[in-house]
């Protein structure tokens, strides 16, 4: 069995952006790899009471805490 391999040069990443690779098998037997940029990672501190409230909302909404924060921040930025 012969495999055709193509090499591509990936762009250098100077930020803390993480990348995700998806593999898809084509009908002709080849495998297509797709490189996607994902979100940047940031960190910050929350008071315990605010974190507890965030956890309650995340459980109630069945979403991650990160997703709740992204939604709230997007709404805030739109209204500034």
Curated annotation (Swiss-Prot):
GO biological processes: regulation of DNA-templated transcription
InterPro entries (UniProt xref): Arc_rbn_hlx_hlx (IPR013321), CopG (IPR002145), Ribbon_hlx_hlx (IPR010985)
Function in brief: Essential for virus function.
Protein name: Uncharacterized protein C-80
């Amino acid at each position: 069995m012969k495999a055709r391999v193509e090499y591509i040069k990936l762009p250098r990443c100077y930020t803390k952006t993480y990348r995700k690779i998806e593999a898809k098998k084509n009908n002709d037997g080849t495998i297509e790899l797709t490189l996607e940029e994902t979100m940047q990672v940031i960190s910050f501190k929350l008071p315990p009471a605010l974190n507890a409230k965030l956890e309650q909302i995340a459980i109630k909404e069945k979403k991650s805490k990160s997703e709740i924060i992204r939604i709230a921040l997007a709404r805030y930025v739109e209204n500034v």
